Amino acid sequence: MPLSRLIIQQFRNIKACDIALSPGFNFLIGPNGSGKTSVLEAIYLLGHGRSFKSALTGRVIQNECDQLFVHGRFLNSDQFELPIGINKQRDGTTEVKIGGQSGQKLAQLAQVLPLQLIHPEGFDLLTDGPKHRRAFIDWGVFHTEPAFYDAWGRFKRLNKQRNALLKSAKSYQELSYWDKEMARLAELISQWRADYVAQMQSKAEQLCQEFLPEFHIQLKYYRGWEKETPYQQILEENFERDQTLGYTVSGPNKADLRIKVNNTPVEDVLSRGQLKLMVCALRLAQGQHLTEKTGKQCVYLIDDFASELDSQRRKRLADCLKQTGAQVFVSSITENQISDMRDDSGRLFNVEQGVIEQG
């Protein structure tokens, strides 16, 4: 469902804005520091309950204000508007409303508004630790497997309890009861993740090949422990090692999506521009898989579109985004940088010192 309207109040340097949006492309044009990234950040907050730039709520609330508001309206397939909103206060209090109903959960926001973010710091998906790639996989599983969210939450709680017990346990028998349920959840979570990667892998590799035809891209899922060994057996066999270290070494919390280019780690081969294109390909593949499985469309947020990309690569990405038919928000310093994306259905907004006006 595309956003038809966006209202932002007291968010960073945006005191207040109320804008009607295109179901296709929406361009935010302005100099650095003008507030265009803050618009993307506010939309991200609306879909995730947090900023992608700061974990501290106080930093995104406007100075001398006690709270912020972000509200949106969506058009569903029947052209009915669904209102959603989030209110955050400096003391950490968060209120979520969906369809006018208060007390909703952040996970429900994420279900209503599936977002894909492409921004200058997004290389961490490819170059940093496994947690970023686990989050990438889990975004897809969350949106396609209804039971995943609760199962993953239960596993993490059990893992935390197990780590606490490791410090005092005198034998493995003291952990065996907890490990049975933990192993059941681990096998379930791992299978969901493996199925998801298998389903979207060909699309991801195809898009990577289109964006980077000079390279052979390989994706491989690692579940976090030895492939052929049941997880409960791993827990029992590794008890002494886990106890020495003070935490559970193996498990779905160690899973990874291993990505190689010509059998070499991506960071050793690709330039920054090529890394950005690969991130774009992976995000687009996820969005297309979501649409195929659920009928939902992603909303794409692209911050600093021209960064790291020459004109040919910008055009390639623009063409691919157009083909999705999804709603896209793009920030750019100049109109010239987004010329390949412009059409009659898109809307352009000029952003200056936190003021957003339709161009």
From Swiss-Prot:
Positions contributing to ATP binding: G30, P31, N32, G33, S34, G35, K36, T37
Origin: domain of life: Bacteria
PROSITE patterns: RECF_1 (PS00617), RECF_2 (PS00618)
Keywords: ATP-binding, Cytoplasm, DNA damage, DNA repair, DNA replication, DNA-binding, Nucleotide-binding, SOS response
GO terms, molecular function: ATP binding; single-stranded DNA binding
Alphabetized InterPro entries for the sequence: DNA-binding_RecF, DNA-binding_RecF_CS, P-loop_NTPase, RecF/RecN/SMC_N, RecF_2
Cellular compartments per GO CC: cytoplasm
Cell location: Cytoplasm
GO biological process: DNA replication; DNA synthesis involved in DNA repair; double-strand break repair; SOS response
Known role: The RecF protein is involved in DNA metabolism; it is required for DNA replication and normal SOS inducibility. RecF binds preferentially to single-stranded, linear DNA. It also seems to bind ATP.
Family classification: Belongs to the RecF family.
Annotated protein name in UniProt: DNA replication and repair protein RecF
Gene: recF
